[in-house]
Amino acid sequence: MKSLNKFLAAIFITALLFATLKAEDNSIKKAENFKLKDYNWKEYQLSDFKDSKAIVIIFIATQCPVSNAYNSRMEKIYEEYKNKGVAFIGINSNKQESIEEVKEHAKKNNLNFVILKDVNNVIADKFKAAVTPEVFVLNSEFDVLYHGRIDDSRKEEDVKSEDLRNALNEILQGKKVTKTETKAFGCTIKRVN
């Protein structure tokens, strides 16, 4: 019986290891240029931001309570870093959230950074983004320097690790990002297919 338990434990640990490795392999290392329109129908390309010291891409939602819990934090981080050469791009890829809803949500929540609509979740698919909010920090060559969560708690008062801020501070100091990957948490992106 003991040997059976050890055998089953070994299988479980091996499966867990492969699942973890597979999840890590799913992260993109470099983004491709893309074109999307914002809620005012203005077209943007990722390359429009190539002169930035860092480009923060945040997959966001209007209806997700987790993403909405981060609205004020996203805006605070944007305000803190916008004059330091950091570009911010919000991307809404949820099929059920219209451009008008995205526009209204941005105005209601005072989100002043660029917010683009990914109509057929093409960009979410290319980034392999799974949830909202989910962050990708790129350099001017579109290499992914950080991927994951904004911080470690849905409740602002419980935050212990400000992962996005930490990554941005290291980038702006010319350092290598210490923690390049964290687990993003939130609502799944509602895809077309």
PLM regions: where:
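A short beta-strand-turn-helix
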Residues: F34-A54
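Short, thiol/selenol-centered motifs that function as redox-active sites or metal-ligating centers
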Residues: A61-A69, V135, C187-K190
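Structural microenvironment flanking redox-active thiols in thiol-disulfide oxidoreductases
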Residues: N68-N109, L116-K126
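Thiol-/selenol-based redox modules, centered on thioredoxin-like
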Residues: N139-N193
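Short, internal strand/loop/helix patches
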Residues: H105-R149
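Bacterial Sec-dependent N-terminal signal peptides
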Residues: M1-N26
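Short active-site neighborhood of thiol/selenol oxidoreductases, capturing the structured segment around
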Residues: S47-N68, L168
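Short, small/polar residue-rich loop motifs at catalytic or cofactor-binding pockets
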Residues: K29-K30, K53, A130-T132
